[in-house]
Amino acid sequence: MALLALSAVLQGARAQAPETEVGTLSVVIENDYFARTDQNYTNGWRLQYLRPKGAVSDLTDWLGKTFLDVDDETRIYEGVSIGQNLFTPRDITDPNPQPGEHPYAGYLYLEFAGVVDRTFAVDTLTTQIGVVGPLALGEFTQNSVHQLIASQIAKGWNNQLENEPVLMLSFDRTWRLWRESRKYNFDLLPTAGVSVGNLRTEGRLGFIARFGPDLQDDLGPPRIRPSLAGGGFIAGAPDFNWYFFTGFQARGVAKNLVLDGNNFTESARVDKRNFVHEAEAGVAVHIGGFRLAYTMVRRSREFDTQQDPHYFAAISLTTRY
């Protein structure tokens, strides 16, 4: 319902702006409710706005030209996001500490992004600043939603990680490696990236493959880190289009705050796995300048005492605005 209401508002605003001046607005919701679980990475949401080249700051323009070989024909976007991720153990009805289970943790953040879109590749540089702990409002968010949908209230948030500020820098490159153009098109988009910070420090490799009648030059639907990045922009605005997609990502993880526990105080922790991988599949539909996408994700075990891989779904709505 929220996505439908947002789309109605944005359609009216978008119609009043010249096509060459509009940016891109996207909302992503990830939740394991669709997999009938309520544990580990249990919910995430992110709202992002990307503005086009003519509106980017002098700093973004200088960074692109200095470090990324940007010229006047390159498409550049500058973006800001706000988001929140929630993590819980398997049994949210137990108010006591649960050793060996995923610690309770909330993460609230702002993200600033620069996107450089060239013919052969897209580079994305992001900075996340935020907080882990009670100030991230994880307990309020989860239990407010659970009350709204008449679901079980989580009783163990008193055991969550303590407040800790977070800074994380990330760089990702996605290559437009290969496209087969016939009645139905197929393309392959390899990706590589690295993140450094006290939230996560990791390197990653992966790919996205898409199949459909008219594959635009975007990168697939947006996602929430550390998943496959996708794209926060829409390269075109067809009246109707669709494509199926699948993807895989492998990550080498040196640091994960929500598993390792607080850096400066005693807190719950588990022994993380240094190698994590995930697979995804979904469908995206373009209708009148909007892109609506549904993605199902399987993430491998992230810590030694985790019993099973984790499944969750992502829903995203993107529009030119």
Label the model's feature ranges.
Residues N96-G100, I153-N159, G193, E266-R269, ...:
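Extracellular loop and loop/strand-boundary signature of outer-membrane beta-barrel proteins
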